[in-house]
From Swiss-Prot:
This is Rubredoxin. It comes from Butyribacterium methylotrophicum. Fe cation binds at C6, C9, C39, C42. Rubredoxin is a small nonheme, iron protein lacking acid-labile sulfide. Its single Fe, chelated to 4 Cys, functions as an electron acceptor and may also stabilize the conformation of the molecule. PANTHER family: RUBREDOXIN, RUBREDOXIN-1-RELATED.
């Protein structure tokens, strides 16, 4: 699955890991994240993420 990188702080969302601290289970694709999910490092929305090159 595609990893996504926060354009602001560089946090990498890895679908294989998810974001368990914020209730996102491993195996959750970026597109399937809740609309109100934000970067756990800097708090920006999903709109501020780009696919990892």
């Amino acid at each position: 699955m595609q990893k996504y990188v926060c354009d602001i702080c560089g946090y990498v969302y890895d679908p294989a890991v998810g974001d368990p601290d914020n209730g996102v289970a491993p195996g959750t694709a970026f597109a399937d994240l809740p609309e109100d999910w934000v970067c756990p490092e800097c708090g920006v929305s999903k709109d501020e993420f780009s696919p990892e090159a």
